[in-house]
Amino acid sequence: METRKPAERLALPYSLRTAPLGVPGTLPGLPRRDPLRVALRLDAACWEWARSGCARGWQYLPVPLDSAFEPAFLRKRNERERQRVRCVNEGYARLRDHLPRELADKRLSKVETLRAAIDYIKHLQELLERQAWGLEGAAGAVPQRRAECNSDGESKASSAPSPSSEPEEGGS
């Protein structure tokens, strides 16, 4: 318990409590506070030592990041992060709803969900190209094959066949 009278304790704003050492107007006799708001009892001998050659490289007390440790700030930050994670998870759930039914029974990770969605989209594109080729093929036009890109970052040689792809049709 503190033995000082309330008049002896002076609560200064944090910006004044982190003033450079040895600057006129600073009050080294006042109890300093750390970022967790616990009073630090430093007598005049400690302040002299801090100003001496032992601490030549340190001209300032450590500046506390006051707002980053406030409970309200932490609660708001954590709630924003929880909301962001909820939205991301909801997006993955909606994406899984659009995948073929054979994948609905499996528990897919986020990466597996993205890869399955990419494979399924490629499969649907191939079906559309085949359908377009079938319609235009009767008229004698040859469909132009667009350049293939691997948007999932894997090389073409390492990509496995799509779990949602249909078996190739037999010969003509």
Curated annotation (Swiss-Prot):
GO terms for molecular function: DNA-binding transcription factor activity, RNA polymerase II-specific; protein dimerization activity; RNA polymerase II transcription regulatory region sequence-specific DNA binding. Residues 145-155 have a biased composition (Basic and acidic residues). Its main location: nucleus. Residues 156-165 have a biased composition (Low complexity). SUPFAM superfamilies: HLH, helix-loop-helix DNA-binding domain. Keywords: DNA-binding, Nucleus, Transcription, Transcription regulation. It holds the Pfam family HLH. Residues 144-172 are annotated as: Disordered. One of its GO terms (cellular component) is RNA polymerase II transcription regulator complex. GO terms for biological process: regulation of transcription by RNA polymerase II; skin development. PANTHER family: BASIC HELIX-LOOP-HELIX TRANSCRIPTION FACTOR, TWIST (PTHR23349), BHLH DOMAIN-CONTAINING PROTEIN (PTHR23349:SF108). This is Achaete-scute homolog 4. The gene is ASCL4.
